[in-house]
A protein has these predicted regions:
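Vicinal oxygen chelate
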Residues: 1-7, 44-67, 71-100, 119-124, ...
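N-terminal beta-strand motif that seeds the catalytic metal site of vicinal oxygen chelate
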Residues: 1-12, 22-28, 82-89, 135-164, ...
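Core segments of cupin and vicinal oxygen chelate
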Residues: 4-57, 113, 156-218, 280, ...
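C-terminal functional regions that serve as terminal interaction/effector modules
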Residues: 8, 203, 208-209, 215-226, ...
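Short amphipathic alpha-helices in soluble, non-transmembrane regions
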Residues: 13-18, 99-104, 168-169, 260-265
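Short glycine-/small-residue motifs
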Residues: 59, 132-133, 296-299
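Short, structured interface segments
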Residues: 61-65, 117-143
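A common structural junction motif
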Residues: 103-108, 174, 265-270
Length: 341
């Protein structure tokens, strides 16, 4: 999950303390030269940190403009506005997570239950970003933390049927766990959460493949269409990288064939690093597409990753079977880079 932030180091401190996102994969200050369609046609400088929670789940790309002041939305986004509304964070113990969470940031008064029976609650970080802490029983390792990594996202859409077609085919979220329409009590703590919604919760029926699949695990995409209030585009009049959830990122294998599939589906790459980008400590090939409402989806095919930076141990992923998971001991070794406060 990409998160536009006013102060990258201050934000990472908060995410370490509250969400245990404490293992850095890379940290780099550089110029974002390829995102011109979304940065006003000009390259801009930025500082980014990719941080993971080694219990399992996806990571945060914590992203700060340094050549301009990042801009907040001119309105307070409501549930169903177009774009990434909420980041899902999985938890091995939802009761303990709720009890332990700093009450300053809780939105939910109590633990709620999703329509498909999962316990969850909502929190808001100091920058206005909302996270759904949701129970999961799939884990890479047990560190004793009450939260894990990214489990997916809740996306506001204008036409749920059109978005379902996109996410079930182009992104492979082919299993509809639950779909319905109405008012949902588990959303009441959110702005406009008492509205009528069309709502669908998706996952993928096939086990994930690739080097990092044991760590990243299964994910969910939840689509919400507000039937009472028209959704506004959360990034209207702003740049990618401005404050908020800037993109949803997927680890992929075979960028060229993926490009062909996306073009055939009517969602061509809008940004393509063409061959390889170098983030200093990590390298790979990245591209972007837009969902039917213009929400940005990033694909990254990783070529190089740091395993243990202290001794200069980096793994070249281009020299191994891309579909085969990395050994668990090797993935766990990344945890030795953990930053402790």
């Amino acid at each position: 999950m990409g998160i536009g932030i006013p102060d990258v180091h201050e934000a990472w401190t908060w995410y370490r303390k509250n969400l245990n996102m404490d293992v850095p994969v890379f940290e780099e200050a550089a110029t974002a030269a390829l995102m011109l369609p979304y940065t006003g046609g000009k390259p801009h400088d930025r500082h980014a940190i990719l941080a993971m929670n080694m219990q399992g789940g996806g990571g945060f790309e914590i992203w700060q403009y340094t050549s301009r002041t990042p801009v907040a939305a001119s309105f307070e986004p409501k549930l169903g506005d177009l774009g990434i509304n909420i980041c899902k964070i999985k938890s091995p113990n939802i009761k303990a997570a709720f009890a332990d969470f700093d009450k300053t940031y809780l939105l939910s008064k109590d633990i709620e239950t999703t329509p498909n029976g999962l316990k969850h609650f909502f929190v808001k970080d100091p920058y206005g970003n909302i996270f759904q802490i949701i129970e999961s029983d799939e884990w890479f390792t047990d560190r004793g933390d009450t939260t894990g990594g990214v489990y997916g996202a809740i996306l506001g859409v204008s036409d749920i049927e059109k978005s379902l077609a996109f996410y079930t085919t182009v992104l492979g979220y082919d299993e509809v766990i639950w779909q319905g329409e109405g008012q949902f009590s588990d959303l009441n703590s959110l702005k406009s959460g008492k509205s009528n919604f069309k709502r669908a919760i998706l996952t993928h029926s096939k086990a994930r493949k690739g080097g990092f699949s044991p760590l990243l695990g299964k994910t969910q995409i939840e689509l919400v269409q507000n039937l009472d209030e028209k959704g506004q585009n959360i990034y209207e009049g702003r740049y990618w990288g401005d404050l908020g959830f800037i993109h949803l990122c997927f680890d992929v294998i075979g960028m060229k064939s993926l490009q062909e599939e996306c073009e055939a589906a009517g969602h061509p790459f809008t940004v393509d690093s063409a061959n390889s980008f170098d983030m200093g400590e990590a390298a790979g090939h990245f591209s972007y597409i837009e969902d039917p409402d213009g929400t940005l989806i990033e694909f990254v095919e990783t070529h190089k990753i740091p395993i243990l930076k202290k001794i200069g141990w980096y793994l070249d992923l281009t020299k191994r079977d891309a579909l085969k998971p990395l050994p668990r001991w090797m993935l766990k070794s990344m945890g030795l880079n953990r930053k402790k406060d």
